[in-house]
Amino acid sequence: MGSGAIPIVLVFLLVFLTWQTIYSSNRDLVRAKEWGDLARRALPFGALALMALSLFVVQGYREGWVLITWMFVSGALIVLASVLSISSTERRANRAFRSGNFQKAAELYRELAEEKPLARHHAYLGAALGASERYEESVDASTEAIKKDPKYGLAYYNRALVLRRMGKKSRAVKDLKQALEADLPRRFRSAARKILEELA
């Protein structure tokens, strides 16, 4: 393999890994056939792919301003794509949740669930309600997420955490096992296993 092929291989490897990350984080959208939302989530991938492909054109120019302009435009495109990949309501809800304002997060997630009743929106609503100690509402929201997508593991996981807080150990164990069998992100899998060990 020549030295010119190495950047090509690295670019395609980067594009492939980026797509895998986007796909694995959004399998629920694929199951729900929400192609528009999936495409929106893939905008940063598209921007990165465009940047990677345009690199081959830019390499031929010797003027420094071309490379600097390319870097600036590519960076701006990636930032813009990242901003557009998630709705402003979801971004505000996520920010409220991360900052501990669970009441505001619940309001915004409820708005999202009413606007577009995806399993993820109901699961996020359930998480915010659970963090607000509104346990019955949280269980209802997570149950609605499971009805919408029985393979959405995060809904089982969130419901299990709330059931555990409510003292319903056997139901929590059942949901944690379901979460591990379903489509649960890797970082939650280890937490689910640890909680199962504690409850056993």
Segments from the language model and where they lie:
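Short coil turns that delineate tetratricopeptide repeat
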Residues: K116-P117, P150, L184
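Register position in tetratricopeptide repeats
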Residues: R98, A131-S132, R165, E198
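Long, contiguous interaction/recruitment modules in multidomain scaffold/adaptor proteins
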Residues: M1-N94, R98-G100
